[in-house]
A protein has these predicted regions:
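Active-site region of glycoside hydrolase catalytic domains
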Residues: 2-166
């Protein structure tokens, strides 16, 4: 899941970036770590913080492994749906910002967070320096067939407007 700064302040931007590429998730939720899966492919090495955190679970990673994993690529594709707001706390450490009651959600209770489309692409480009393609985005909603036999889809139209114009 993506991390977006709560405000445009340099402190919040850096807090969001550090959480996005950092290793704040518990070991049983490691699959959502962006740097762990992308750094070897695009930068040619696993993040040191991840190597330390996962060391007892990892096989030996050889130079030959890294040569195979790290190949020249023309672009990066990323699925981007939603994310969390992050701000710099009073102590300077990143902290998650709670969503307000009534925050918009999809039919599957995913939060509608269009700013993650901007910040996700920005953070990924700044780190990996490759053209970005959004390979997947969208929402689940309860489609209703109107009396005219059509699905007017106002929820999805609103969702796409928010994400396209973020």
């Amino acid at each position: 899941l993506f991390r977006s700064p709560y405000t445009d302040s340099p402190e919040d931007i850096e807090a969001a970036r550090s959480i996005y590429f950092g290793f704040d998730q518990p070991l049983d939720n490691w699959t959502w770590n962006v740097a762990w899966f992308n750094d070897p492919v695009f930068l040619g090495e696993y993040p040191k913080e991840g190597l330390e955190k996962y060391k007892e679970y990892l096989p030996v990673i050889t130079k030959e492994d890294m040569e195979l994993i790290h190949q020249p690529l023309d672009f990066m594709g990323q699925n981007i749906y939603n994310g969390y707001w992050i701000r710099a706390g009073k102590d300077g450490k990143p902290e998650y910002v709670d969503r307000t009651e009534g925050f918009p959600k999809t039919a599957t209770n995913w939060p509608v967070t269009p700013e993650c489309l901007y910040w996700g692409v920005r953070f990924l480009y700044e780190r990996y320096h490759l053209p970005m393609y959004i390979t997947e985005n969208g929402m689940a909603c309860h489609d209703q067939i109107a009396a005219d036999g059509r699905v007017h889809d106002s929820n999805r139209i609103d969702f796409l407007d928010k994400y396209i114009y973020c």
